[in-house]
Amino acid sequence: MFKFAALLALASLVPGFVQAQSPVWGQCGGNGWTGPTTCASGSTCVKQNDFYSQCLPNNQAPPSTTTQPGTTPPATTTSGGTGPTSGAGNPYTGKTVWLSPFYADEVAQAAADISNPSLATKAASVAKIPTFVWFDTVAKVPDLGGYLADARSKNQLVQIVVYDLPDRDCAALASNGEFSLANDGLNKYKNYVDQIAAQIKQFPDVSVVAVIEPDSLANLVTNLNVQKCANAQSAYKEGVIYAVQKLNAVGVTMYIDAGHAGWLGWPANLSPAAQLFAQIYRDAGSPRNLRGIATNVANFNALRASSPDPITQGNSNYDEIHYIEALAPMLSNAGFPAHFIVDQGRSGVQNIRDQWGDWCNVKGAGFGQRPTTNTGSSLIDAIVWVKPGGECDGTSDNSSPRFDSHCSLSDAHQPAPEAGTWFQAYFETLVANANPAL
């Protein structure tokens, strides 16, 4: 499994590398590719995107995508990645993504409050960049129907985050949720999921992509020493499985959250993470619409760092692409579909954190690479903005019940309001430091 990742890394580092044929799963084409364009016996070169064509085993290569040796592969839509193939395919292919009117209103008001005309114009442009809608309380769920109706009228794809597990955010405090296990939280969560599924069922012609429960399963990999996480372990698993099954039944394409390179990307965490995700997949009945994994949700890591940030010392998976390429073969071997989406909404500026684990309103951050399906990797379906930039990570007020000490560290922007509320000063920083510039 590691040989495959190593081969991809070598090919990317040495563009002039040439061999007679690419091996199974090796690269065989793409913009700028100068290596071999023929595949080893028993495999066929298949275009995954404009930047990457891959040698797939003949029994996995669709007949319509077969190419002749030495030619540029034709445009095609394939499932990408390795391992089990979801029934949905890449949900972003050929789709326009719906813009949240709620976030657009937040951005418009924020831009109106900026006195610098140039910065205000840049800020206003953020409203045209699609982000996910977070359903972090059951009270927000009734709004989903209106969003779906609007998207249907425009023939657009809707992106949502399912985020309301009981005893949520078990290893931190800033985003503690409304449900507790001590107060029938798991059943309340299932009712919340049922309400989401019921809304989506009314719009079978609208494509929906969902990120499932940020941080939840990652906490079960690394933080079972925290009593709250240990107590929530079975409920997290049962809740995620329930959500996946219910949303699968109404055609939602799903990506389970898997933390980021500085969390599950450490070598010791990769295999346990892959095994946990595979267990969830099997226990949910191998749902055809569970497409894969979401990484870097609401975090700040680069997809492809120009050089390792000093805070990543000791981890060869120092950015999201290294993490993804290390995790993907383990997922595949464990029987989990290895397809990814990556949040780059606030990853425009690197080398600004004191510690890799600093996650709260990181000072000096900027908006990052815009959402696209031109990801440069067959493993990655899309670069996305899951976290709506400008909505706060957590309060710096140490008297708040949801105060987390990470939000008062020296590399956290302060003073900061409660998690999820608008943070004007931070939004202006994200706009000013955007890379690429707005």
Swiss-Prot record:
Which cysteine pairs are joined by S-S bonds?
Answer: 28-45, 39-55, 170-229, 360-407
**One Pfam family of this chain:** CBM_1
> What keywords tag this UniProt record?
Carbohydrate metabolism, Cellulose degradation, Disulfide bond, Glycosidase, Hydrolase, Polysaccharide degradation, Signal
Please give the SMART domains that the UniProt record associates with this protein: fCBD
Q: Might you give the EC number(s) for this enzyme?
A: 3.2.1.91
Similarity remark: Belongs to the glycosyl hydrolase 6 (cellulase B) family.
The UniProt function text for this chain reads:
Shows enzymatic activity towards crystalline cellulose. At long reaction times. It is also able to degrade carboxymethyl cellulose and barley B-glucan.
The name on file for this protein is: Exoglucanase 3
